[in-house]
Amino acid sequence: MKLCATSSEPARAAWPLSEPALAYFPDARSASDRDLAAGAYSPGVAMEHIPVLLDRCVELLTPALTRRNPDGRGAVLVDATLGAGGHAHRFLSDLPGLHLIGLDRDPQALQIAGERLAPFGDRVSLVRTRYDGIDDALAQTGVAEVSGFLFDLGVSSMQLDRTERGFSYSADAPLDMRMDSDAPLTAADVVNTFAEKDITRILREFGEERFAARIAKHIVRRRPLNTTGELVELLYDAIPAPARRTGGHPAKRTFQALRIAVNSELDSLRAAVPAALAALETGGRIVVMAYQSLEDRIVKTEFAAATASRTPPGLPVELPGHEPEFVALTRGAERATPEEIERNPRSAPVRLRALEKVAGRPTTARRDAR
């Protein structure tokens, strides 16, 4: 197995490991929303990692990975959100010739996935980076074009299970929320040092919280806040009682907003999807699973642009060379079936979208022409 670092990360020695536990929504993707809404999460209890929509991901990506050889030889799959490696393990097991590049910013996730995928040897390359570091990761691993991309967005249950990471509002822990434990900014930094107007903006834009200004005012008045428990208590005071009785846990939107801000999740996604589309070879495929509307909106917008014709509107026929570069493999966003949700409650809120690249024009040229 090859262990790589991004250009901004020092190379790391081999990772000693422990066993995994992983993956994870309702309609606002707070770290614990998926599991709490499904009644599937208890603080401090490690949960079995059941990869979300695993069979559907295999069904969608395998044709691209077996175009050259039925065993996957010559194909490269990038798992841009490696986590504990559940999806990656299935693809490597099914396709004994496949090479997989796994990306994750969380060193603990890479430790867990590294041990899990160690039996596959040099067919696996792991890179510590955010998923918007795709270009650098491919350069480091010597890969020019990719056969398939898989994105499973959001926070993993592995991160939720580690109470000290501060992602869950169901247990008292330090206000951390960093996906990369070496990153400088924490949720405590945001609530304790940001201006009231900036906290309001974060809660409104990233949490779609209608009481954003009210909550920000309470935060500034009461800070410093150092634990998730202190923040939850404040939110119960800040949000009017009638609103607390509807729409799920009153903390979910604030926790979602802080987590997104701390980890620059949406900016990273906006850069990652176009980079992935540009790196796909003709016949390659991309699958993205999103768990809340902010993520899905970005994916939907990028996919719509990728599947649009460049023929000027009003012409009755498609101009040669102006055909869409990608075709959709799903009709809109697919949801988990009742059977899947019963087997894996965490899949209830997922929205899956997939594309196939059918033309060889550079994606960057298409985007510049918009």
UniProtKB/Swiss-Prot annotation:
SUPFAM superfamilies with a match to the protein in the record: Putative methyltransferase TM0872, insert domain, S-adenosyl-L-methionine-dependent methyltransferases
Region (Disordered): 332-370
EC number(s) from the headed UniProt entry: 2.1.1.199
GO MF terms held by the record: rRNA (cytosine-N4-)-methyltransferase activity
Pfam families associated with the record: Methyltransf_5 (PF01795)
Positions annotated to bind S-adenosyl-L-methionine: G85, G86, H87, D104, Y131, D152, Q159
Protein name: Ribosomal RNA small subunit methyltransferase H
Species assigned in the record: Mycobacterium sp. (strain KMS)
Chain's gene name: rsmH
